[in-house]
Design a protein with these regions (language model features):
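Conserved single-residue anchors adjacent to enzymatic active/cofactor-binding motifs
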Residues: 3-9, 14-238
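Short, charged alpha-helical interaction segments and adjacent helix-coil junctions
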Residues: 20, 24-26, 99-104, 201-331
């Protein structure tokens, strides 16, 4: 197949083959996390979006969503000269509550601040001249992260509210934030939440290498329809090119972040050789986090082991369990 693709690169004749015949031979489904597919799946299917929101947001039985209306995804500032922002999916329900959904491939502190900014803007936008503050409705921000940012806990769902610092039962209602670290998701950890498990499996198990879909995903009406919308045959050549371009940009971004992170690690290691390995590791980690991905991962641990550090030092520096580090050192 690679030869077949390469043979058609001359005279700019690759497009039809690569994104038509060749693509369909290789792939059956697209990854739902890509910008194109995520918006196609959830941006124009109310019942499907309602199912996702009810499954993933911390809503009580009385707070469940029953009907929504889509809103423009561009958030225009209230004041002249303010900052315009765009979200992936935005809707409101019959109560007037706002629901903002974002699919993010890479974690950064800047993204967290953007989430706060967007939710605050949605909350403030409800205020009308002469209106009552008591009429303002809550804003829910659901953020699906294809990355790990909380290394100090196995929890992958993080819900935030404005609470009293000494009594969490005292809450200022209005802003609700949910962050889900998709790479941490394991179905058995939330087996009692069936729809949450199914939607997270849909987001994490289906990709360009998928050939067969598990029956329990297909048996759910909304998820089954979403799977159909991921079939390669339903996309145009232009859409497939946009899909490829998206993943290319993600790959470039990750490479740049990893390079910055590794550079910080190496600079810290050099200083550490002079002032003590422990202190140097700490500086390297701090600089690496400031310039790059802000986390220690398995690849970094392997590099440190190759440099001759002990399993205990690598475990301390990367925050990975000692058992995992020892397993890496034996491979």
């Amino acid at each position: 197949l690679k030869i077949l693709e390469n043979s058609c690169r001359y005279e700019n004749k690759t497009v039809t083959l690569r994104h038509g015949f060749f693509k369909q031979m290789v792939m059956k489904y697209l990854d739902p996390k890509a910008d194109l597919t995520f918006k196609k799946i959830f941006g124009n299917h109310p019942k499907r979006l309602i199912s996702l929101l009810n499954a993933l947001l911390p809503l009580s039985e009385e707070e469940q969503i029953h009907e929504i209306k889509y809103l423009p995804t561009e958030l225009v500032p209230q004041l002249e000269g303010g900052k315009n922002t765009i979200v992936d999916v935005l809707c409101t329900d019959v109560r007037g509550r706002k629901f903002c959904v974002e699919m993010q491939m890479e974690w950064s502190d800047a993204f967290q601040q953007r989430v706060l900014f967007n939710a605050s803007k949605l909350y403030v936008s409800q205020a009308k001249k002469g209106g009552k503050y008591s009429e303002l409705q809550p804003v829910y921000s659901l953020n699906l992260i294809n990355d790990i940012f909380a290394h100090d806990t196995p929890d992958f769902i993080h819900n935030y509210r404005i609470v009293h610092d000494k009594d969490s039962n005292k809450v200022i209602e209005g802003l609700h934030f949910t962050f889900i670290e998709l790479p941490k998701f394991t179905p058995h950890s939330i087996a009692d939440k069936r729809m949450m498990v199914l939607w997270l499996r849909f987001l994490t198990e289906i990709n360009s290498n998928t050939k067969d879909i598990p029956a329990d995903l297909l048996n759910d009406p909304e998820i089954g329809k979403a799977v159909e919308d991921l079939e390669v045959s339903g996309f145009t050549d232009a859409e497939l090119r946009a899909y490829d371009k998206f993943w290319d940009s993600v790959s470039v971004e990750r490479t740049l972040l990893d390079d910055r992170y590794q550079k910080g690690m190496e600079e810290g290691m050099e200083k550490g050789m002079e002032k003590g390995m422990e202190k140097g590791m700490e500086k390297g980690m701090e600089k690496g986090r400031a310039e790059g991905k802000h986390e220690a991962n398995t690849e970094t641990a392997q590099r440190l082991l190759a440099m001759g550090l002990s399993a205990e030092q690598v475990s301390k520096a990367t925050q990975l369990p000692l058992e995992i580090i020892k397993n890496l050192s034996n491979t």
